[in-house]
Every structure is written in C-alpha cells, then in structure tokens.
Amino acid sequence: KRNPEQFMEMQSGGLYGLVFEDNSMVKEQRKFALKTLHEIGFGSAALEDSVHSGALEVVAEWIKSEGEVVDVAENIEKAIGNIVWNITFGIELTFDNDIVEQFRQYQQEAIPLAGTPLMMFLELFPPLRKLDFLFGNKIKRLQELLDIIGSMVTEAIKMTEQSFDMDNQPRSYVEAFLREMKKNKDAGKAEGNYTYQQMHSSAFSLWAAGFDTSVGLLRLCILELVNHPEVQRKIHQEIDQRIGERRIRNEDQKLLPYTCAFLQEVYRVGSVLPINFIRQTSQDTEIEGWKILSGTNVLPQYSMVHSDPNEFERPDYFRPERHIEDDNFVKDPRITPFSVGKRSCLGETLARMEMFVMIATFVQNCRFTCADEVPPPVEFTYGITRAVKEFSVRIHPRN
C-alpha cells in the first residue's frame, strides 16, 4: 500500500495520478493506463520503428562531430523526449525542437531538490514546510519548478485537445483519456475518476518518468563502454557476426546474449531508482525478528540488493560476464531496475525495448573513446532518480 506523499501533493494539488494509495481509483486508473499503452502500440512494430529512427538520428548527429569531444546527453535527450512526448500527448516533434530542452532544464533542477534529505523529512513531518526559510527555501523553489513544468503539461494537453478527432483511434495516453471523458459525458454519467486533474497528473508522471530514467541509463551505457573498451569490442564483434549491417530489431535479443548481459549489468550498477516510493504496511508483519506494525511507513530500497556482496561477487566491478552461462544470457530476478510488484513501472516494456534497440544501434554504427587520456569516472548525482555526472567522449563512425 502506498502512502500519500508530499512531493506528489506538490505536483498534483491532490491525490491524483498513478502512484498513490491502494484504493479503487488507483487500481482503475492503472488498469486504464496499461490498457491504453498496450492499445497505442507498446510492443508494436510501429513503436519499435520510431525508436530505431530516433537512434539513427542520434547516430547521424554524433558522426557530424568527426571525432571531436562531445557530450552524448543532448541528442539522447532529444530522441527519448520525442518518443515519450508522442506516447503521452500524441504530438510528433522534430528532432531539433526546443520543447524537450525546456522540460529537461526545469526537470534537471527539480529532481535533485525532490531527492534531498529535507524532502524525505517532509514526507514524515509535513509541518516542516513552514520552516523552509531555514533551509534556503528549497521547498519553495521545487514548488516553482513543478508549477512551471505543470503549466507546460497544460499547454501540451491543450494542443492535443485542438488536434485530436474524437472519432479516430487514440494514439496517445491523453487522447485516450479525453475520449473516455467525452464518452462518460455523452452518456450522462458522472465523471468519476476521469477528471482533468487525474489526466494532468498522470500525463506529468508518464512524461517525467519515461524521459529521465531512459536518458540516465543510456548515458551510463556509453560511459561504461568508454571505461571498458574490451566490453565494447565484444559487443562490436557479436553484432558484426550475428547481425551485420542490417537494422537492429528488438527480437534480436536472442541473437545478442552478450549485449543483453551488458544491459543487465548497467541496470545493476545504475540502480536508477535508488530510493523507492514510500509504502505503508497493510498489516502487522515481522522481518528478521523486527516487528512492524500495520500502518507503518516503510521505504524499500531494492537497489541495495544490486550492490550486496552476498548476492553478487565483487559488486563494485562492472562485469557483464556474470550474466552469461554456457554462452547464453541469463535474466536475473534479483535485478529490479523498474521496481517490483503491482506498481512496477508502467513503461517497463517500452524502456527495455528502447534500451536494447538504441544501444545496439549506437554500437553497430559508432565506436566510443575517451575524450582525454584518462577515462571519465563513473560518478553519480542523486535525487528521485540516480544519474551519472556530466562527461564527454569522442565518437567515431565504424563504417
């Protein structure tokens, strides 16, 4: 059972969205979201084509650098941002649009603020907000950023409302939600849980979560390739021998076990969600002798398993080979980058497909090397999500 959180209250102005309490509203809305995402193409060839096209646009921009020092983040953000924007709002953006960049700037400032110890304490003691001035008005600044991003979501919804023909099949989450609202209204039904606030909060969450986590993991992939050139060579060889120059498809995972092992090791090392959402026990329970009463706030940290030496030998070492047995990739249930249970990430299917198709396409076409003689360190920044610090590389075309 989830406990209502102050951060989400600040974002939504109430208990809206897809990540709140264990009640009928959340169950209904998650079911609607999963059904909608499936209907608009999660797992479809069309969506995979869109991801592959985005990857090729990134490669084309990188190759223009002609081996000069570049930050890989900008073009990855454009590609992922366009995909998630289209899924959320049904609006196709050009690769060089500035909407994604505006979102990124505000979100980049908001995420570390949302993950500060101050916000953790605010979840447990809401009156702390009145003492915000003692901590540099960080809560106030976070609220300002959330309001700005929220207003941008509002404008995006308006664009969708103006362009979407209700007689057509929805192509996005917001279009499907608008159609459901109209259906209830036309039938003379109460709006129930299909309110504007619910749509806005859910669209906000789908966009923010789908953008930040995928970008962070893809950047970490590039950083690990640069720091481990022997791993990069093995992936090059595997793709050259088993795929050649034809386009990468998601179904190629069965042909590329080492590439899959590399990605699973990135998920383990990256732990993109280091601190999960606050939960609440629904009944008295006991864990290793510790009694936990019903209604107690708990904060499960699944990522601790990823770095546990009792689970993984020498966990500080990046070693894709730990996920290979008899030349086959072995999926490890202990590695949970998208959380677990009924409230695991709604976009996990898309995220895993994005990661595989994009990284395999990047490595098929590019070779990544250090910007300087010393490889960039693998260092993280922390917030609601965890991401590697800024770094630069040199990118060389393989063909």
Labelled PLM ranges:
Residues 300-327:
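Conserved cytochrome P450 K-helix/beta-meander segment immediately N-terminal to the heme-binding cysteine loop
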Residues 1-47, 71, 76, 80-83, ...:
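Cytochrome P450 substrate-recognition site 1
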Residues 229-232, 331, 349-385:
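Cytochrome P450 heme-binding "Cys pocket" and the immediately downstream C-terminal segment
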Residues 151, 155, 245-288, 309:
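Conserved cytochrome P450 K-helix E-x-x-R motif and the immediately C-terminal K′/meander segment
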Residues 41-53, 63-86, 94-103, 127-151, ...:
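Cytochrome P450
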Residues 14, 204, 209, 288, ...:
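Cytochrome P450 heme-thiolate "Cys pocket" and heme-binding signature region
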Residues 80, 84, 145-154, 184-238, ...:
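Central I-helix of cytochrome P450 enzymes
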Residues 38-42, 67, 116-121, 141-218, ...:
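Conserved cytochrome P450 catalytic core segment spanning the I/J/K helices
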